[in-house]
Amino acid sequence: ASSAAAAXAPSTPLA
């Protein structure tokens, strides 16, 4: 996923 999509998550996308 792009950085912009990850920004929506409250924490890290890997968590």
From Swiss-Prot:
Catalytic activity, as annotated: ATP + H2O + 4 H(+)(in) = ADP + phosphate + 5 H(+)(out)
Protein keywords: ATP synthesis, ATP-binding, CF(1), Hydrogen ion transport, Ion transport, Membrane, Mitochondrion, Mitochondrion inner membrane, Nucleotide-binding, Translocase, Transport
Superkingdom of the source species: Eukaryota
Compartmental location: Mitochondrion; Mitochondrion inner membrane
Biological process per Gene Ontology, one example term: proton transmembrane transport
Any one of the GO CC terms: proton-transporting ATP synthase complex
Documented EC number(s): 7.1.2.2
Keyword Translocase: yes
A molecular function (GO) term: ATP binding
Keyword Protein biosynthesis set for record: no
Family: Belongs to the ATPase alpha/beta chains family.
Subunit: F-type ATPases have 2 components, CF(1) - the catalytic core - and CF(0) - the membrane proton channel. CF(1) has five subunits: alpha(3), beta(3), gamma(1), delta(1), epsilon(1). CF(0) has three main subunits: a, b and c.
Function description: Mitochondrial membrane ATP synthase (F(1)F(0) ATP synthase or Complex V) produces ATP from ADP in the presence of a proton gradient across the membrane which is generated by electron transport complexes of the respiratory chain. F-type ATPases consist of two structural domains, F(1) - containing the extramembraneous catalytic core, and F(0) - containing the membrane proton channel, linked together by a central stalk and a peripheral stalk. During catalysis, ATP synthesis in the catalytic domain of F(1) is coupled via a rotary mechanism of the central stalk subunits to proton translocation.
Name of the protein in question: ATP synthase subunit beta, mitochondrial
